[in-house]
Amino acid sequence: MSAKKPMALVILDGYGHRETQADNAITNANTPVLDGLMANQPNTLISASGMDVGLPDGQMGNSEVGHTNIGAGRVVYQDLTRITKAISDGEFQQNETLVNAIDKAVKAGKAVHIMGLMSPGGVHSHEDHIYAAVEMAAARGAEKIYLHCFLDGRDTPPRSAENSLKNFQELFAKLGKGRIASLVGRYYAMDRDNNWERVQKAYDLMTEAKAEFTFATAVEGLEAAYAREENDEFVQATEIKAEGEESAAIVDGDAVIFMNYRADRARQITRTFVPSFDGFTRNVFPAIDFVMLTQYAADIPLLCAFAPASLENTYGEWLSKEGKTQLRISETEKYAHVTFFFNGGIEDEFEGEERQLVASPKVATYDLQPEMSAPELTEKLVAAIKSGKYDAIVCNFPNCDMVGHTGVYDAAVKAVESLDECIGKVVEAIKEVDGQLLITADHGNAEMMIDPETGGVHTAHTNLPVPLIYVGSKAVEFKEGGKLSDLAPTMLALTDTAIPAEMSGEVLFK
């Protein structure tokens, strides 16, 4: 069998690009190898943060998200950004599960109930999503739109719900239909420790309008709770109903949409709407269409608007299906990233996949040994390149990230310099076997060691772009505007391997 010419991906963890030289451990390090590559090899900058990696706009990237996106060959959206994006591009408003539930209730002259954590917190839900659901129900002809508000005060300040409630009151006034039907603190509605007596108060409130208190408006109900010394999280079951208004309890034929996207605190209240539930005795059990925004648990037999995104045909799985061999190699600190996260959350190796782990040094903090285990890792990586055994190799050098996190500038510079030496050996090996190499990063860190705003030590990741360098015999010219999820399709194209349909990332050369 002839020796394989590997396609290698080397991820320099935490190696971001920043124009400013001040406090930049990367540009201030002595790096003849990387400087030479940047001067003489095809290279570009790619995005590793925010919506480009499925995070909220402007949010810095991290290693888990970065490696997941690289391996998937598509942007992997977190639930918050997935729903936000679906709303902005109209996919939410056309979602078949939501459309069917709303339309069925409208046709029967029934109500559409929307429940969820009314908060801009963004941890379990986002009120912008709930706003969109109300507008969607109204646009599809629902006359009775009832909003059941779970109040936050944990992921938001303890008494901050008034603004949210006013916004929804204004929305209903503008629509000329619908109203806030109930208030209850998340302590009751979103318990996750089997305190069913709490959950029952929220269930009875929504299904029977059974409440400790009734007020004409939501803001009045909230003010009364504050007067009772109850912060948002602990607001007792409160019915909102002005004189002459009909009850907004959930009844047969209604549609109920639960707008929380995070599962752990949504499961219990959702299970109370399942026929087989026995956590407490329900006085009423309405026959309804109940829609979970995301799948709270695989064993909850209710409708789900946004099923879990499948990460089928990641780079590793696809290479395996194509009968190719691959190696994943890193030291302890980033081993999980080049294996579990790179494989889309799959623990086991694919057929043809091998793994090598180099132990990270046993030091209190990595500024004490900025080169970490890079020399040994490089030795093993070079041997793997020359072995002729592997079609593809993925390697992570953790130094810039792990030493960057210590905040010790001089150590970060040393980390970069030790990497430069290592990269020189890797490039030499690749050229020797006529292989191909992409050098990049999963996010930035070491390029900003002092916070420009506070003047204090900067130990966090950045939201800056990362370099992408090609070494190999192909005449490659990069396109601008790439992101981490473009790397897998690019590597497949470089090796003349078919690209699976699931990979929506782009090939990064012209």
Curated annotation (Swiss-Prot):
Cofactor notes: Binds 2 manganese ions per subunit.
Essential cofactor(s): Mn(2+)
Keyword Methyltransferase found: no
Residues noted as binding Mn(2+) 2 in the record, renumbered to the chain: 13, 63, 442-443
Gene Ontology MF term list: manganese ion binding; phosphoglycerate mutase activity
Pathway: Carbohydrate degradation; glycolysis; pyruvate from D-glyceraldehyde 3-phosphate: step 3/5
Keywords for the protein's UniProt record, in alphabetical order: Glycolysis, Isomerase, Manganese, Metal-binding
GO BP annotation list: glucose catabolic process; glycolytic process
EC number(s) on file: 5.4.2.12
Catalyses which reaction(s): (2R)-2-phosphoglycerate = (2R)-3-phosphoglycerate
Positions annotated as active site in the UniProt record: 63 (phosphoserine intermediate)
Binding-site list for substrate: 124, 154-155, 186, 192, 262-265, 334
Residues that, per the record, bind Mn(2+) 1: 401, 405, 461
InterPro entries for the chain: Alkaline_phosphatase_core_sf (IPR017850), BPG-indep_PGM_N (IPR011258), Metalloenzyme (IPR006124), PGAM_B_sf (IPR036646), Pgm_bpd_ind (IPR005995)
Keyword Protein transport among UniProt keywords: no
CDD domains linked: iPGM
Pfam families, A to Z: iPGM_N, Metalloenzyme
Assigned GO CC terms: cytosol
Subunit relationships: Monomer.
Family: Belongs to the BPG-independent phosphoglycerate mutase family.
HAMAP family, sorted: GpmI
PANTHER family to which the protein is assigned, alphabetical: 2,3-BISPHOSPHOGLYCERATE-INDEPENDENT PHOSPHOGLYCERATE MUTASE
Function comment: Catalyzes the interconversion of 2-phosphoglycerate and 3-phosphoglycerate.
Protein name: 2,3-bisphosphoglycerate-independent phosphoglycerate mutase
Annotated organism of origin: Aliivibrio fischeri (strain ATCC 700601 / ES114) (Vibrio fischeri)
Lineage: Bacteria, Pseudomonadati, Pseudomonadota, Gammaproteobacteria, Vibrionales
